Amino acid sequence: MALPAVIAISLGGMLGTGIFVLPGLAATKTGASLWLAYLIAAICIMPAAYSKSELATAMPSSGGTYVYIERAFGPLFGTISGIGLWLALVLKSAFALVGIGAYVLVVLGMDSAVITKTVALVFLSAVFLLNIVGAKKAGSFQSYAVLAALVVLTGVFFFGLQAADQTTPFFAKLQNDIVEAGGRMDLIFTIAFVYLSFSGVTKVAAIAEEIKNPSKNLPLGMILSLVIVTAVYVAISFVLTGNVGLQDLNENYSPIHTLAVDLSGPGYEINGINVLGAGIAIIAVLTLISTVNAGVLASSRFPFAMSRDGLLPEFMSRVHKKFLTPANTIAITCIAIAATVLFLDVFEIAKLASAFKVMMFVSVNLAVIVLRETSAQWYQPKYMSPLYPYAQIFGIVTGLFFLWFLGAVPLLSILGIFLLGTIIYYSYGKEVMRTGVLKNYGHRPALYLFNKNTKEQPAEEATSIDLSSLDPKIASDAGAIVPLLGNENSPEMLVEIAAAIQSKKKIQALNITEVPSQTDLDAFLEEPPVASSLRRRLSGLSASKNLAVDFEAVVTHELSDTINQLSSQSSCEWLVMAWDGRSHRGIFISNPIGWLLANINSNLALFKDNGVRHVGKVLLALRPGRKDRNFIEIAQRVCAFYDAALTLLHVVPENTTNKNIFAMEEKSSSKLEQTKTKAEVTIVKSDDPVGTISGMSTSYDLLILGTPEKDNWINVLFGGGKDKFTEESACSVLRLTVKD
């Protein structure tokens, strides 16, 4: 699928209710400033388009937003989002059906709410049968309808631009059939209200696997279609409010027909029917039918997919024996749409649909932040969202801001969806074994509040899983486990460090590959070339250095959980991993290292390899007053392994007295007396410990640091100086977390 097809599909998801029905309702809330509401809404939705593009290139065949959210946040939030997405599409389809009824009636010269709903239900019945039988040609029909709509709307714009004379006041609203002065609050409400118009911008992401060069064409197609449809919305809303009075748009569900009739006048009538208006109505009906069909098609897939995932009753995942379509979920969806048409006010339908779409856009932006910052190994998108994470944060903040202005009913409805989703999950889906990336790797502030290891509230123990389920050959008596995730500069150096710091002899090296939960692990029974290469290299290291190294390759759905299980072995003394030494952990969310620091049962050694291959001088930098006996012992092991000299460094404030320095030096020297390697104590006065240690690291081969004893809110939210030592070090760095 080339770029033009991507643009056509994305446009097809937006051109419908957003231009043929919604502008009439929206115009009565803000008047001539309606075009500005569309423009601002498009800008605020842009980050969601970036985010959806990134997610789609990482999971091209996953099935869309529901799976993205389920993968990032887990089955519970997957259930909630699935229901929310389903309801949003149900509401949008119902809104489109009301528009179909309205456009049919204006052509027939009739005006009746009952007949409008009757016509809507007739068209819904036709769409229901079409989806049960299966309509393979619906996509091409939609493309032609969209093209025709664009051509006609362009003509309407140029025809109406010269006649637009009602552009003041800029802010106005219709209150009890009287035009009153509006304000910025009315504009903000309208911005949130028209979010529904852009709900289809990310629709094309669901078929990313069919797109040629998706890393380029998918985001480009989304952005271009968003720009095109925004131009259409802005242009048509400008000429609509400039030519049609707000009284004529009150409860008007066919505003473009009204605009066409006002522009053409009686000269375009044949037998009492305005030709231009009738032509617009026919194109509107065709486009809206396409919208309803796409809505039923997509929305029926959500309960179907959730049932397949064990989150809804089994009967929803059954397919029709003859037509092979999800007949049960299609029927449930169409019944819900019919009930919405019959019993809900049209304005409330649009408002609720917009609210649910706002929440989904927010969730998509949040999912990208979670997946990026947790560094899930399988998450490797071919397209990376620009301006990360600021674009996503902008999308989240503006979305929540506008959501508030939609009023209490949409907010309560969203709360109801959360409650319903939670009930359904605990009724049907609580046995699902998948967990989201956020739960596996840890949301840092949540970790700080709820999972922090304290004497008053011990951390929850990890679920015990038999290690034989990972691999029967994994050594149960290994003193150190070295997970190799593919980001190591030198796996050999990492294994050497593991051998140096542990007190036992055996080392277990594991090449761990994380794959998405929808991928069957049985597809990876054959050892990949990378693992075979690592096996050969570590075998050579074992022979040359006389080390007891076992190597195995492991495939898992949950990287951190697997590492935690491995470290839970009673004999495992150390978990040794490569580390990039990032000082900034991202906004609000930690990477897997943060999760491991709070959850693993063994000691943790993080090694940042700066390319040093000969270790002759080791610098141990510890804060004065720290319990440093364990660190000195480990540093001595490293020095003995490499036959290196040890320097114990304390950096103290400039105002420290000489008396205190002398006492500190005596105490530290006494701790080094029993070392079998060459060792010395160095104390430096400085109010810039990062700069001091960084400068001294140029004279050493390995810097050993401890993990800070406690976090504060600045470090929790934004990262802190604790990693700046590592980031600015000239030599390799070994950061140790010793469990008490």
Question: Positions of the model-derived regions?
Answer:
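Terminal cytosolic tails of multi-pass membrane transporters
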Residues: I369-Y388, S413-S490, I497, T519
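Membrane-interface "cap" regions at the ends of multi-pass membrane proteins
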Residues: M1-G24, T28-S33, M46, Y50, ...
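C-terminal membrane-solvent junction of multi-pass transporters and transport-like membrane proteins
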Residues: M316-T325, F361-P410
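Membrane-interface loop-to-helix entry segments
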Residues: I115-Q166, A181-G182, S199, M222-V227, ...
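TM-loop-TM module centered on a large, flexible mid-protein loop between adjacent transmembrane helices
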Residues: V67-Y68, V106-M110, D177, G221-N293, ...
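Small/aliphatic-rich secondary-structure junction motif
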Residues: I465-V530, D550-E552, K617-T682
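Gly/Ser-rich helix-loop-strand patches that form or flank binding pockets
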Residues: L566-H614, S697-D740
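Hydrophobic transmembrane alpha-helices that form the core helical bundles
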Residues: L25-K29, A37, M46-L124, F128-I132, ...
